Amino acid sequence: MTQPIIPRVGIASDAHQVEPGKPCWMAGLLFEDADGCEGHSDGDVVSHVIVDALLSASGLGDLGSFVGVGRKEYDGVSGERLITECRQLLAENGFTIGNVAAQMIGNRPKMGPRREEAERRLTELVGAPVSVSATTTDKMGFTGRGEGVAALATAVVWKAGA
């Protein structure tokens, strides 16, 4: 009798402060009508939270241990590169990605009109289905005041023979 493959689930959250004048990268897309988020990278909160959820599900650490804050080679790094390198790390460790669900929390950028485009791009990068949703906090808290953007993600992975 063969061993069943048991899925592993990871969750993650991330938040960044809005930085006026910085290009807005979110969910792998450039939003030219919104300010971006501060950070040592491109500030793509959705891409970051996807990486964090994948690392959580696989037990391979978190975004901080994966890229670190003080590593110069990751200054300004794109969310696309982070996802690509994370996907490679999971594959090297025998993991297959099942799917990812990510939710952006904030007033801007407006994800609704580009949600399907974001899902296509992230699905391509992750190599598995990615669903994207967005919500606001009805003017409450730092995201409601437009001071920042947050995101949540859940990822499902499995390891053959585990």
UniProtKB/Swiss-Prot annotation:
Annotated Pfam families: YgbB
Enzyme class: lyase
Entry's cofactor comment: Binds 1 divalent metal cation per subunit.
Sites where the protein binds 4-CDP-2-C-methyl-D-erythritol 2-phosphate: 14-16, 40-41, 62-64, 135-138, 142, 145
Record has Repeat as a keyword: no
CC cofactor: a divalent metal cation
Annotated residues for binding of a divalent metal cation: 14, 16, 48
Protein EC: 4.6.1.12
Tree of life domain: Bacteria
Presence of the UniProt keyword Mitochondrion in the record: no
Signal peptide: none
Listed GO MF terms: 2-C-methyl-D-erythritol 2,4-cyclodiphosphate synthase activity; metal ion binding
Reactions the enzyme catalyzes: 4-CDP-2-C-methyl-D-erythritol 2-phosphate = 2-C-methyl-D-erythritol 2,4-cyclic diphosphate + CMP
Listed pathway(s): Isoprenoid biosynthesis; isopentenyl diphosphate biosynthesis via DXP pathway; isopentenyl diphosphate from 1-deoxy-D-xylulose 5-phosphate: step 4/6
Residues carrying the site annotation Transition state stabilizer: 40, 136
InterPro entries for this protein: MECDP_synthase, MECDP_synthase_sf
GO biological process, one term: isopentenyl diphosphate biosynthetic process, methylerythritol 4-phosphate pathway
Oligomer and partners: Homotrimer.
Family in the record: Belongs to the IspF family.
HAMAP family assigned: IspF
Function: Involved in the biosynthesis of isopentenyl diphosphate (IPP) and dimethylallyl diphosphate (DMAPP), two major building blocks of isoprenoid compounds. Catalyzes the conversion of 4-diphosphocytidyl-2-C-methyl-D-erythritol 2-phosphate (CDP-ME2P) to 2-C-methyl-D-erythritol 2,4-cyclodiphosphate (ME-CPP) with a corresponding release of cytidine 5-monophosphate (CMP).
Name of this chain's protein: 2-C-methyl-D-erythritol 2,4-cyclodiphosphate synthase
Lineage start: Bacteria, Bacillati, Actinomycetota, Actinomycetes, Mycobacteriales
